[in-house]
């Protein structure tokens, strides 16, 4: 029986529990590579798998979680050795049973760009290697993922190199976000669009704490939902998890009414947990839940549901824009970012991105623009090109669920574009034109809209993901056909039930007082059912029209949005004076405009003391970003971009100081290290970035750092503040030993500890001076310690 049949025939599918917990019980050394045991201790693995099978597991995960080329370097085995050995061990354990074997794949352990340095295609290649090596598995499971972009690379690697079923589970925190800020809705929309077989959550929390996460996920998908919780929460002092097998099963039972189909255990669980889970599920019926998933698009952190008029900003397009064309030819990405940020502040919900211009490599520029935009803004993008190759490159580079602009009713367009929309799980704008051009009548445009819808459904694209553009013709040239456009919008909306799109500004080409024409055409189209006006949101009367329409039609309940924008005193824009640079530098930093920020810094240095720029502009901008991050209004990718922009300013200042012969003053030296036996350093690296941008000299000792190395470095470099990180309960003892050795050697220092498994109580228990729950708190501690 294969996985897909298993899902259809069984009420519930039972997974196994933790592998690491079991290997540690058998004697896995701290800091050892679990995947090396596939070859060195195969009998251990066979025994563990058999214990889970006997407990009731329908599927066991092969011991391949960290079997990628980077993590295996330490033990000397290759992917091609470790993965087949793991699958063979699992197969041996499954003999005589119907138990399936999953190729278990975890995160690479490096951040992808724009947050990190690993490229999408590099990540793809790493996953491809694992998938090819695990071809003999029954299904592929990607688990414990926190970055949706990395997971997309993994899924594409699987779908393009294997026919095996795909299961994806991400790790969410109690704030309903992953470590990188991924929203549950964005995860569901993106992964279901990519065509995986099941999605869910694993790790981080116990079944009780995961309930609200699972509840939200079950509202956003019709795929089978997988839940693999931890055995509660770990006690960092005892390394024990606080949820017993009986309580685990009891809390898991409460997930059943939500529609959960697949259940297992993660960290801290063992065969006894799976046995209790299987006993609880015996005789119970799966609760089938069908959701009407709305028309929506998303970035990783933000989902836009098309349940009311939403503004698509039109300004990222070179047509008729001399300055934009110059920016494209000069490869000036900051100009594009500036246009994006300006539109979002003005009220755009989605941004159209078109970089088509003779004389440039449109494919390369589109990819560059998409990546840069997603590093700075969180609204979804509409990918706009007439060239299928450009669209595919943009779709591959995009993180989330975008809109494709566009397909039309020509057979060649349908054949070239719709397969891409289906493969990458996008929504699509259908233009009501064919080889004969734009029909004059509303009836013919309606027919073309229906053709596009029918073809999309044939390709397996959801009806909700098809948006129709009935095409705005210029009133100056075809005044008699203006009403044909709005009448077509009305029919498409009411008779086909599709979302509608119009390029509003086209109506007024060639006419005086264009704003008046645009404003009235927009209101007319909205009353006929326009959902997605493509327009210039920077023109206040246009965004005001949309807001007023929402108020008058009771979409904006109690006029909350309208009053928030127009109820207070009118804000006046700052005067365009010589002080503009001082006003704009914090803005440039906060919005991730690196080139503009660096240029403004250089200009300010001609008239302002370097340290005044740092203390009065750079640090406050970073503080503001940090505060927004703590409130959950800003997420890790944007925080890193802000820090990177500040770093560009610091580099300008540093070079200026060197050129003048002055001595750069450090705010203080700090050692950072991930403790012995722990190979996870993503969190520590983020702390490093922020500390450096606040002006501290960071000595980064890396990961898996020996206790004595920390002591020696502190003494040799006269460092008085040390930060230690641990991400695994098994390496907490290394953190304790490092602190102990520093104290025994009378090193004059204060110690900060942090990491996913560290708590304030544990910090106090081992004699650390400070506990930092995140990177921003590490900065706050450093500032307090150094008095700056």
Segments predicted by a language model, with ranges:
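Domain-level signal for soluble alpha/beta catalytic cores
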Residues: 1-467, 473-788
């Amino acid at each position: 029986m294969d996985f897909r049949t298993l899902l259809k025939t069984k009420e519930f599918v039972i997974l196994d529990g933790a592998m690491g917990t079991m290997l540690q019980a058998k004697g896995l050394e701290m800091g050892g590579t679990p995947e090396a045991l596939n070859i060195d201790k195969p009998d251990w693995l066979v025994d563990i798998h058999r214990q889970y099978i006997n407990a009731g597991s329908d599927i066991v995960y092969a011991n391949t979680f960290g079997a990628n080329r980077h993590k295996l370097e330490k033990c000397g085995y290759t992917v091609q050795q470790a993965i087949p050995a793991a699958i063979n061990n699992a197969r041996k354990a499954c003999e005589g049973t119907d138990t399936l074997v999953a190729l278990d794949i975890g995160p690479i352990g490096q951040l992808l760009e724009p947050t990190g340095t690993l490229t999408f295609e590099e990540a793809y290649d790493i996953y491809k290697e694992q998938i090819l090596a695990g071809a003999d598995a029954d299904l592929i499971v990607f688990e414990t993922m926190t970055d949706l972009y990395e997971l997309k690379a993994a899924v594409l690697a699987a779908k393009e190199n294997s026919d095996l079923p795909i299961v994806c589970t991400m790790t969410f925190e109690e704030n309903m976000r992953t470590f990188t800020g991924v929203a549950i809705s964005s995860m569901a929309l993106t992964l279901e669009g990519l065509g995986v077989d099941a999605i869910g959550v694993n790790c981080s929390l116990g079944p009780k704490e995961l309930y609200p996460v699972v509840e939200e996920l079950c509202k956003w998908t019709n795929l089978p939902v997988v839940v693999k919780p931890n055995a509660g929460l770990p006690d960092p002092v005892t390394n024990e998890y606080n949820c017993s097998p009986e309580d685990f099963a009891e809390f898991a039972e409460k997930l059943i009414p939500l529609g959960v189909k697949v259940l297992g255990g993660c960290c801290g669980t063992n065969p006894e947990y799976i046995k209790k889970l299987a006993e609880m599920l015996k005789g119970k019926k799966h609760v089938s839940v069908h959701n009407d998933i709305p028309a929506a698009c998303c970035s990783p952190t933000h989902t836009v549901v098309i349940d009311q008029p939403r503004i698509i900003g039109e300004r990222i397009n070179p047509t008729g824009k001399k300055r934009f064309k110059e920016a494209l030819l000069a490869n000036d990405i900051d100009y594009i970012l500036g246009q994006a940020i300006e539109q979002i502040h003005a009220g755009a919900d989605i941004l159209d991105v078109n970089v088509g211009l003779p004389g440039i490599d449109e494919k390369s520029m589109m990819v560059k623009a998409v990546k840069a935009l997603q590093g700075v803004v969180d609204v979804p993008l509409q990918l706009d090109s007439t060239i299928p190759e450009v669209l595919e490159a943009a779709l591959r580079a995009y993180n989330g669920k975008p809109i494709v602009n566009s397909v039309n009713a020509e057979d060649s367009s349908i054949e070239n574009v719709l397969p891409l929309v289906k493969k990458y799980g996008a929504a699509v704008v259908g233009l009501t034109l064919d080889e004969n051009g734009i029909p004059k009548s509303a009836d013919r445009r309606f027919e073309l809209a229906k053709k596009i819808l029918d073809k999309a459904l044939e390709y397996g694209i959801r009806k909700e993901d098809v948006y129709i553009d009935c095409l705005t013709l210029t009133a100056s040239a075809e005044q008699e056909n203006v009403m044909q456009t709005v009448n077509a919008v009305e029919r498409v909306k009411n008779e086909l039930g599709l979302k509608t799109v119009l390029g509003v500004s086209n109506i007024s080409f060639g006419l005086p007082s264009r704003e008046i024409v645009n404003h009235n055409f927009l209101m007319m189209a909205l009353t006929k059912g326009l959902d997605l006006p493509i327009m210039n949101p920077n023109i206040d009367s246009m965004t005001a029209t949309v807001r007023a329409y929402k108020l008058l039609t009771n979409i904006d309940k109690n006029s909350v949005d309208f009053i928030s924008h127009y109820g207070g005193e009118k804000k006046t824009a700052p005067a365009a004076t010589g002080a503009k640079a001082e006003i704009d530098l914090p803005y440039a930093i906060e919005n991730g405009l690196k080139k503009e920020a660096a240029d403004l810094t250089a200009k300010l240095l001609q008239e302002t003391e370097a340290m005044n720029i740092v203390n009065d502009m750079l640090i406050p901008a970073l503080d503001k970003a940090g505060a927004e991050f703590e409130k959950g209004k800003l997420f890790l990718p944007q925080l890193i971009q802000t820090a990177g922009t500040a770093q560009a300013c610091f580099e300008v200042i540093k070079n200026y100081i060197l050129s003048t012969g002055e001595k750069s003053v450090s705010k203080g030296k700090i050692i950072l290290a991930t403790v012995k036996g722990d190979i996870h350093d993503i969190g520590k690296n983020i702390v490093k970035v922020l500390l450096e941008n606040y002006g501290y000299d960071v000595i980064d000792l890396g990961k898996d750092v020996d206790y004595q190395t920390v002591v020696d470095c502190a003494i040799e470099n006269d460092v008085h503040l040390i930060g230690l990180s641990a991400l695994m309960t098994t390496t907490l003892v290394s953190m304790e030993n490092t602190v102990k050795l520093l104290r025994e050697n009378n090193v004059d220092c204060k110690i900060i500890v942090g990491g996913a498994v560290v708590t304030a109580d544990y910090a106090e228990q081992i004699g650390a001076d400070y506990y930092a729950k995140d990177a921003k708190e590490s900065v706050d501690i450093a500032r307090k310690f150094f008095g700056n």
